[in-house]
């Protein structure tokens, strides 16, 4: 069954294995399609320019079809299929390490921080990246940024699809995911976190294989903190001219969306 979230009149005959649905949209509109199979839910987020055919994936916690691994800058990353989205299981660890006291610059070299200025921290948790550096100094959503060729940084809306796909109570398209500056959802965070490595009983179930780690952060003053307690993930979407959306997890079941 397909769930239509638009404002145009929609045909009721959508509870079929294949369906053709016509409605008006403007070029540049981002459309969210939600598919259901038994108790499973899957979503596709796209900005179509012509008629499109969408295939919903209901398998999860398996390597992405045809791309089980990605080799990039001397490292091998594993992929994970979570319904209709394909993610890297490991945090990116690419670029040249700079001290926490320094800021990256737009110099055609990817620069990262490693927690406590220890290279082993980047090996374990991935690099810590300032937003502009991660985006490679563009604000365009869907950009490759520091990702491998053919991959892109997830937008705020793509994060919402992931959150709804893995939460047991608030599903894709629920207004719950538009809430900011507070805990959201029911158990999305625990389902995305690793089963070990989090302090204060913060370990997750890793139910979908996302393998979120508590890599900590580097703040504006260059101070490192919260490794083992917090995990932070950027979205490639600006909140305003000074901030961007991000997700972070602590020892709770739900996720915080803030900037």
Regions found by a protein language model. Give the residues of each.
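A short, solvent-exposed beta-strand micro-motif common in secreted/extracellular proteins
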Residues: 24-37
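Short acidic/polar inter-strand loop motif in beta-rich domains
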Residues: 35-45
């Amino acid at each position: 069954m397909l769930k239509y979230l638009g404002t145009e009149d929609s045909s009721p005959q959508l509870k079929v294995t294949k369906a053709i649905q016509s409605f008006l949209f403007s070029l540049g509109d981002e459309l969210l399609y939600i598919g259901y199979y038994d108790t499973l839910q899957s979503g596709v987020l796209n900005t179509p320019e012509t008629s499109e055919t969408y295939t919903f994936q209901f398998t999860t916690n398996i390597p992405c079809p045809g791309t089980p691994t990605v080799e990039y800058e001397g490292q091998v990353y594993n992929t994970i299929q979570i319904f209709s989205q394909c993610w890297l299981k490991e945090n990116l660890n690419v670029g040249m390490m700079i001290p926490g006291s320094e800021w990256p610059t737009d110099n055609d070299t990817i620069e990262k921080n490693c927690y406590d200025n220890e290279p082993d921290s980047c090996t374990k948790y991935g690099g810590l990246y300032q937003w502009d550096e991660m985006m490679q100094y563009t604000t365009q959503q869907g950009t490759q940024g520091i990702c491998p060729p053919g991959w892109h940084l997830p937008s705020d809306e793509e994060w919402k699809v992931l959150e709804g796909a893995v939460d047991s109570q608030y599903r894709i398209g629920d207004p719950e995911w538009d809430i900011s500056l507070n805990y959201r959802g029911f158990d999305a965070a625990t389902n995305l976190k690793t089963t070990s490595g989090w302090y204060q009983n913060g370990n997750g179930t890793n139910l979908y294989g996302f393998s979120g780690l508590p890599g900590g952060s580097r703040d504006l003053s260059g101070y490192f903190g919260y490794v083992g307690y917090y995990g932070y993930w950027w979205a490639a979407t600006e909140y305003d001219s000074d901030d961007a959306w991000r997700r972070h997890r602590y020892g709770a079941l739900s996720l915080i969306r803030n900037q």
